[in-house]
Every structure is written in C-alpha cells, then in structure tokens.
C-alpha cells in the first residue's frame, strides 16, 4: 500500500498548533526561543513546548523543532540546553542547519531524529545522498529543485520534505545576505527584514517590486510528489496567524 504523504504545518504559537491539529495536519514544526530561523515568531519556551508536544501527541500528530540558524561559539552552552529541552519535551525530530549542531545533538541525545533544514541549501541528488550517508532521517530540499531533480533524489532511501506553499525568496535558502547587508538583520540568524519585498528601480523601470517573487504553490501536484516518494508536504508560515 502506498504511503500517504505527510502534511506538515507551521506553528508560531500554541494557538497555531491547535489550529494546525484541528485542520488535519499530520505534523507541525515550531521553534524554541533561540536558534530558530523565524526569531520574530512567538516561539516556545520549555513549558510551552511540553504543552504543544503533549497536545499534538494526544492527537497522533508529530512535532519537529527547528534549531536552524547559524550558531556562534559563545552560544554553545545555550544550544546544548536547547537540544536537551527538546529531548525532555519528547519532540519527534530536530531540524538543523549546521553539521556541528547535528553532531552535538547526536552526542547529547543519540536517539533523536535529525532533519536537514532547507537552510543547508540542499539542491541536488549528491547533497541528499551525502546527508543520508551522514545519518539524517530526512532532508528538506531547496524550493528551487525541479521535478526531474526531485525524482532522482527520491531514489535515495531517505525521507524528502518539499515546500508546497508559502513565500519564495529571491535567493537560495541559506545563501541570502541581502537583509544583513542593508539592515544588519541576517536571514541566516532568523531576523530577515525582507528588503526584497521593497520597491526598487531597475534599469529603465523606476518603480516596481522586481525582487519580490510570487508565492510558491504546488499543492495541485501533491499526488505527483507522493507517487515519486516524497515523504512530507511542507507549508511555510510560522509568522502567520492561526487562521
């Protein structure tokens, strides 16, 4: 029997967790107070995280926690605590951006499942294969991958997670420095100011939003994703309201 593709919903608050579960999500992803690529979301302290996991598990919904920002050396102790908080809350997996964070998580909690974040910029068969060989259970692939590239990557015995709805960045995930350059707010630290959404003059065009891409929506192709072996259909939007 063909496996049903997982519907993975975002949650920036407990209200969003409840909304996702009631709407039929198979899993939710959310961030702790630190090391989340959506630092402006409410996010979850230890008690809130435990409450969210308890509520989700009662309804047979999985919870994945994001630790997917660039991490500096002087933050290692807080990072260790973040990993242990997630483990104590009994989350189902960590979504990580940094290989050092992945190694640390393996050392602290060997049984923890690891998902490679889209911030790793995995956009090829070889990238997916490398992460599988490193022991990752799932890879969140770049939004830029084509159907042909996804089909090839799906041959590797690792779960693939694909964004099916949400905003598109002008740059490959994990590679954009636009916000950091213009306003000292790094998207790779969870603080993107989204300057690409502003109007710019380009050549003879003196106004317009040349760098602001239309939203991504491949929901009509979910059946095709399932047929090629994609494990999870991911909805972007931890900054969005519950409704």
Task: Describe these PLM feature segments.
Residues 2-122, 140-144, 149-232, 239-243:
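Active-site pocket-lining/capping segments in soluble small-molecule metabolic enzymes
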Residues 136:
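Anion-binding and metal-coordination hotspots
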């Amino acid at each position: 029997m063909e496996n049903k593709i997982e519907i993975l919903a975002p949650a920036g608050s407990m209200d969003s967790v409840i909304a996702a579960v009631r709407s039929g999500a198979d899993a939710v992803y959310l961030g702790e107070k630190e090391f989340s690529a959506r630092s402006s979301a409410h996010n979850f302290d230890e008690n809130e995280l435990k409450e969210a996991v308890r509520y989700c598990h009662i309804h047979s919904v999985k919870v994945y926690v994001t630790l997917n920002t660039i991490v500096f050396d002087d933050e290692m102790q807080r990072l260790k605590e973040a990993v242990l908080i997630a483990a104590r809350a009994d989350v189902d997996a960590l979504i990580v951006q940094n290989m050092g964070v992945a190694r640390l998580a393996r050392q602290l909690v060997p049984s923890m499942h690891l998902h490679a974040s889209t911030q790793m910029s995995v956009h090829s068969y070889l990238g997916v294969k490398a992460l599988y060989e490193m022991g990752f259970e799932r890879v969140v692939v770049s939004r830029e991958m084509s159907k042909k590239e996804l089909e090839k990557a799906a041959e590797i015995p690792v779960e693939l997670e694909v964004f099916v709805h949400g905003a598109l960045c002008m740059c490959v995930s994990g590679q954009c420095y636009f916000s950091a350059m213009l306003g000292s707010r790094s998207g790779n630290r969870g603080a993107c100011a989204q300057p690409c959404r502003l109007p710019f003059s380009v050549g003879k065009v003196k106004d317009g939003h040349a760098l602001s891409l239309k939203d991504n929506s491949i929901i009509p192709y979910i059946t095709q994703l399932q047929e090629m072996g994609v494990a999870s259909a991911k909805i972007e939007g931890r900054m969005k309201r519950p409704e």
